[in-house]
Amino acid sequence: MQYTFPNYYKEFSCIAGACPDTCCAGWQIVIDDQTLKKYQHFKGPFRNRLHNDIDWKEHVFRQYNRRCAFLNEENLCDIYTEAGPEMFCRTCRNYPRHIEEFEGLREISLSLSCPEAARILLSQKEKVHFITKEKKTKEEVYDDFDYFLFTALMDTRDMLIDIIQDRAVPMQKRLWKLLAVAHDFQLCVNKNELFKWEEMRKRHEDSGYGDRFCNKIYSRINADNIENSSAASACANTPEQLFKKMWKTVVPEMEVLRPGWQEYLKNCLTPLYNGNTDPQSDSGNLYSWQKSEFDFSYPDWQIQEEQLLVYWIYTYFCGAVYDDEIFAKVKMAVVCTLFIHELNVGTYLKNNRQFKLDDQIRICYQFSRELEHSDLNLNRFEELMSEKEIFSFENLLKIC
């Protein structure tokens, strides 16, 4: 069995009571079968509490006011204190370690939803790289595992990460290339022409970011603008208006995990969008200027944006071996990162043009919790990338 993890993985150590939040609230923690059996046979004074606060039908810990039943007033776990750490379920034992499973391979990451893991990721200045180690385990076989597609995904992911980490190229062009590669990869899979992808991928690799590549992108954007050539349509397709539509598409579809999340989004985004509801008004210049001002005032974002993109691509891209949704996963990586940037700028404006690493950490882990702590949200977000025209290839090129 091979195990892959990012180079900063072993820097993590839980900071317990010093953590600004708790990992035991706002999501339902599923108990694995092995731990469930241990709970069934547990003896001692804690037995009744253990049995009463587990939903045995759903295999989850009960919640009270969105908090795990075993989370006490000091934000510590009563299972840990009363029964010992060996009684943790797999999720609680592993978190914030996240594991993606493939035949003969486990890919481990630190979840962005953990404040300390977010701090470690966002503090990385060097390009992240990944370490693979081998461990002798029983051989496993996954039924219907498409190893040909998986190999293509792995090779392409390496290419995508190289694109993201090419600091000699402006981020806008890196994002364009990222989307273009994923778009063409998806076309090959849709046409059952995966055998052509290696040659196409090599062409993408060789084409670089020169005039030919940029002209193709501009022609794609311009063709879409001509198609929507009325004044109202043109104004509605500015980056500001596109982002507004994207938020309005995503937010109502998401399960709210923590009370106040939607209010938080409104408070963050209103200063950026200036409360302007008229798509034909001249607010675009102010919007662009505010974003440029933030980027100048908080230069760390340049590298943090890169680290976030690598995080999303590393964690989710190769999962397309199970559902073929290659382009949707790359779209999700881009949209999530750009959504975080919008929240950054709104927070910067709301806080009288002040923004620190702590603000960045808070935005990232709160955003991640609402998305990654719910399979429903994660799956729906990805579905929206494929289903809704607002997330078309052309629209994403415009907001990069």
Model-predicted segments: where are they?
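Local cysteine-cluster metal-coordination motifs and their immediate loop/turn environment
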Residues: 11-29, 62-98, 111-118
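General N-terminal leader/first-domain-start detector
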Residues: 1-46
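Short, compositionally biased low-complexity segments
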Residues: 11-18, 127-132, 236, 312
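Short linear interaction motifs
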Residues: 4-5, 73, 320-323
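Hydrophobic, aromatic-lined core segments that form the binding pocket/scaffold
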Residues: 171-400
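Short, charged/polar micro-motifs that form catalytic or ligand-binding hotspots
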Residues: 14, 82, 146, 150, ...
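Membrane helical hairpin/interfacial module
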Residues: 27-74
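Internal, well-ordered alpha/beta segment that forms a basic, Gly-enriched binding/recognition surface
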Residues: 83-187
